[in-house]
């Protein structure tokens, strides 16, 4: 498996509103997307952009790795359990892009890695799946099909 672009770092939070204030006021984030619900996954999500590569003029292009803020919706046991262990929230997962989600899934399975569920539509509108942290150096890892042009 060839390592793809780091698309985002997922951060579980008990309050997206409080996390937005933190990234804006403490970390200086200037582009924070509107939060939205993903009922199929039981979460509310908000993306915070980080600067992309320098253009050489001191300015940054868009397209840096994003922070994905994740707040559980009622009934979401997995994120709620994470927050019970980590009441202030914290890093939940990392997400890498691949060109073909089904080929990536087959490769990971052939290596004996535990895929957590079938590919499904994620927050960027592309197919995703997760890999068990015990098989990934202790890190819950999301694999996502690279977004179409213009999407992040």
Which ranges hold each PLM region?
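A short, acidic/glycine-rich surface segment
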Residues: 33, 76-81
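Short, structured motif recognition centered on aromatic/hydrophobic residues
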Residues: 6, 13, 20-23, 48, ...
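Serine-centered coil/turn micro-motif
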Residues: 76-78, 122, 146
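Short, flexible, solvent-exposed loop/turn segments with mixed acidic/basic and small polar residues
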Residues: 1, 58, 81-87
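Core segments of cupin and vicinal oxygen chelate
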Residues: 1, 11-56, 60-64, 103-106, ...
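Short, solvent-exposed interaction modules
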Residues: 82-110
């Amino acid at each position: 498996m060839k390592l793809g672009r780091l698309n985002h770092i997922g951060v579980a939070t008990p309050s997206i509103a409080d996390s937005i204030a933190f990234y804006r006021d403490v970390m200086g984030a200037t582009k924070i997307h509107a939060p939205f619900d993903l009922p199929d996954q039981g979460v509310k999500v908000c993306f915070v952009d980080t600067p992309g590569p320098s253009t050489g003029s001191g300015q940054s292009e868009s397209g840096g790795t994003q922070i994905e803020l994740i707040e559980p919706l009622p009934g979401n046991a997995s994120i709620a359990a994470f927050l019970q262990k980590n009441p202030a929230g914290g890093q939940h997962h990392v997400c890498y892009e691949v060109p073909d989600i089904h080929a990536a899934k087959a490769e990971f399975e052939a290596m004996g890695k535990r895929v957590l569920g079938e590919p499904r539509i994620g927050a960027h509108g592309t197919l995703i799946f997760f890999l068990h942290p015990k098989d990934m150096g202790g890190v819950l890892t999301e694999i996502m099909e690279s977004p179409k042009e213009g999407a992040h």
